[in-house]
């Protein structure tokens, strides 16, 4: 089963995290998502020259908050972690990154 294909496109968000690597970034971001009912469909992370880089696709079908609220909550968490967290609807992300 491909969870990305099975999830309705209108409910997906793309979350990007970039900043200095440190312990607990994935745990902190995942905790916010779990608390607000956002299911993680896909996650990819790497370390590039001491910088943490993560791209996460989440399904908001069961979320208890709207996209704007989630974006604000994650941005606040990013400030706390000293990383940049951007949250976009998947359609916007795809439009901005098409070739």
What are these regions (language model features)?
Residues 1-99:
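A conserved regulatory-domain signal marking ACT and ACT-like small-molecule sensing domains
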């Amino acid at each position: 089963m491909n969870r990305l294909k099975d999830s309705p496109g209108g409910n997906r968000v793309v979350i990007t995290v970039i900043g200095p690597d440190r312990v607990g970034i994935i745990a902190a971001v995942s905790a916010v998502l779990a608390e607000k009912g956002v299911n993680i469909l896909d996650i990819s992370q790497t370390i590039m020259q001491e910088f943490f880089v993560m791209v996460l696709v989440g399904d908001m079908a069961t979320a208890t908050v709207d996209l704007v609220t989630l974006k604000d909550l994650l941005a606040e968490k990013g400030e706390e972690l000293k990383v940049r967290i951007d949250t976009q609807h998947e359609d916007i992300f795809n439009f901005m990154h098409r070739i």
